[in-house]
Amino acid sequence: MKTILRREDCTMSKYLLVVDIGTQSLRASIIDETGKTLSFSQQKYKEAFFSVEKGYAEQHPEFYMDELCLATKELHEKAPEYLEKISGMVMMTFRDSSLILDEDKKPLRPSILWLDQRITRDPHMSYLKWYEKILFRLIGMNDTVKFNAERTVTYWLKKYEKENWDKMRYFVPLPTYFNYCVTGNLLVSTGDCAGHYPFNFKKGKWFSSLHPKSDVFSIPHKSLPGLVKVGDIIGEVTEEFSKKSFIPVGTKLIATGSDKACETFGDGCIDESLAAVSLGTACTIDVVSSKYKEPETFLPSYIAPYQNAYDLEVQIYRGLWMIRWYLDNFGANDIIESQKLGISVEEYMNEKIKDIPAGSDGLVLQPYWGPGLKRPNAKGSIVGFSGVHTRYHLYRAIYEGIAFALREGLDEIMKKTHKKPEYIVLSGGGSASDVLVHIIADVFGVPCYRSTTVEAGSLGAAMAGFISLGVYKNEKEAVSHMVEKTEVIHPDMKNHEVYNKLYKKVYLKMYPSLKGVYNSCKDFYLDTKGE
């Protein structure tokens, strides 16, 4: 018979189990109060998601729990002395992925993930009351509301899976189900409600059923899960889950935040003096404030993984995804050449572009390959082509375009904070590129430094957990004990002058100049044709 570890049998210690449920892999760590990772396991998914139709992205929620158990089992095999002495556990998950459950809290279908591109058209916006339509038009948010609603899966489920919709009792953010599997409590952290839900981030609660945002998302109010404030306890590990996972029975599951919020905290960004830039498939820029401020008009800031703080975030949906797009379409020869040299194609391309002057000889790219909330009709654009440009200029222009878009995001945030960050902290896979890091420093004209760990999200979640347990009094104390600062990269101010001119005279004028063209051409785009 398998031995069941019990929380009360374990001596108090300063270890936390941190579970990072990602899109491509699941990582489990044991982290101590100094920020040191004592044991680590990563489970790379054989199939991150499946698509029953082109553009769909779904996954069975049980899949993630199976991967979690594999990871914690490996931790137990590697270093049982740590897992058996944890003081608690925290979980963080990717955002904006939904699940519907029946009366018995069982999934009715796979979860629809944030990568999913299905759209449900309703040109008349019939989900809104007549006065709401007038209101949204008056405040200039009609297109943004329509964009949000079309990508809210409730409408698709009602239209194409009515039988499942009629059986639905609970409509929940995906982390809710994970919490239920671990503790038996169908609850979700207020830090895990980013997405297409009627959530009031300022007050940390669901909007009432009478609020216009409830009409936009069309989720029955009675179907939404109970909420737990960040830092509070969601529940304790059940005996059933302990048997499968080797996590001690009674271990407290602490409510934290989403992946990006935890990553920002793990970067050490806790006030408006620092900005966190995450360079991944999607790129984000975050600034943390103790007061609720919307980063862009009518778009919310998110709850930080500790109390009384908010993340003002602007996202570039197609961030370093652009590099993969470039290589898939134009990089065949470069991939071959890099293989001959025994280096990655990214290293090879960085060598090719490092001597191209700042501004790519006047080639400017706007990375709207994926639509944004504020500009739902925008598309990607490249201007300035001439005979001097090569494919390497285009590659560098992608880097610069991402940096321009992030700077534009920071400009929007600074309109609310009225403060320019003293430093920018870089994390994510793209931060490994020296060329990209220097471009960002030069575009912003602000010193930058890299996060000390590739697992900044796990570190941030652990810090939030230690604050909850009382190991640290507040976020400032946690950062001082657990986050290290790396070498500072200073901007080249001559390059900054070049980028400043391009940014103000070209980049910022591209969308206003092309907005009418985008509207006229939308019937020719594959993803909007027939609207």
Regions from the PLM with identified roles:
Residues 42-84:
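N-terminal phosphate-binding loop and adjacent alpha-helix
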Residues 54-65, 142-143, 227-231, 251-255, ...:
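Short acidic-aromatic active-site loops that bind/stabilize oxyanions
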Residues 67-71, 263, 401, 405-409:
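Well-ordered alpha-helical segments embedded in enzymatic catalytic cores
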